[in-house]
Amino acid sequence: MLKYSISLILLSLLGFSAVAQNDSIASDSTRYAQKYGLRLGGDLSKIAKTVIDDDYTGFEINADYRFSKNLFIAGEIGTEEKTTSSTYLNATAKGSYFKGGIDYNMYKNWLNMENMIYAGFRVGASTFSQTINSYTIYTTNQNWPQATITDATKHSGLNAIWAELILGLKAELISNLYMGFNVQLKSRVTEKEPDNFENLFIPGFGRTYDSGRFGIGFGYNISYLVPIYKKNKKTPTEE
């Protein structure tokens, strides 16, 4: 419920910003300066989940750089550790990841506004380990109980590559400070698994959902734009 409330607040801020900016534009304006620079931030949802979920620890830094009016080069880097349980397996995944790609702003800003409603694409890569904390040996023989093995076994040198489609928004709260959220649809391309076990969780990708290729994720970000230079943008004069 909290994530939906935050999303509604961000949408309201975006709309309020548009109205306020429209009211402040002089009717004879013909050009304005667009900011170009590096925007750096972090994922608040991972920090919150670290605090409230005893089985999870994660941190992510994100950045984008404005390449043209609507096109941004973007990326994320982070670490995650997650303990996941299934019917017959309890395992802890721990590792780091990197995602790189582009974002395209579909929102038509008023003059010097810098808000975004965007679509993006990422290629992600992760290196991680899986520690098998316990597993149960399944048997159909009713005369023998199922055996649970609790000797932890660590499998290092695992990796995965995936692709992501992203939809999100970023609203400027005050000058150069942004709050935003995004939804990610993910598809695994390759992965290396432990012998005789499947990866239940991949850092950067998330849950694997019983060997399915697809996954989904979301993020709530706060970021700050470090302006490097500005470009003048012409706009038609209002009558």
PLM region descriptions:
Residues 38-42, 73-75, 98-100, 115-121, ...:
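Transmembrane beta-strands of outer-membrane beta-barrel proteins
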Residues 64-66, 103-109, 168-172, 221-227:
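Structural signature of outer-membrane beta-barrel channels/translocons
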Residues 99, 103, 212-239:
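Outer-membrane beta-barrel "beta-signal"
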Residues 36, 55-59, 94-98, 115, ...:
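Residues that define the transmembrane beta-barrel architecture of outer-membrane proteins
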Residues 50, 78, 82-95, 128-139, ...:
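Extracellular/periplasm-exposed beta-strand and loop segments of Gram-negative cell-envelope proteins
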Residues 51-106:
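Glycine- and aromatic-enriched membrane insertion/assembly motifs of diderm outer-membrane
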Residues 44-48, 77-83, 104-106, 123-129, ...:
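Transmembrane beta-strands of outer-membrane beta-barrel pores
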Residues 23-36, 70, 108-116, 173-179, ...:
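Short loop/turn motifs that connect adjacent beta-strands in outer-membrane beta-barrel proteins
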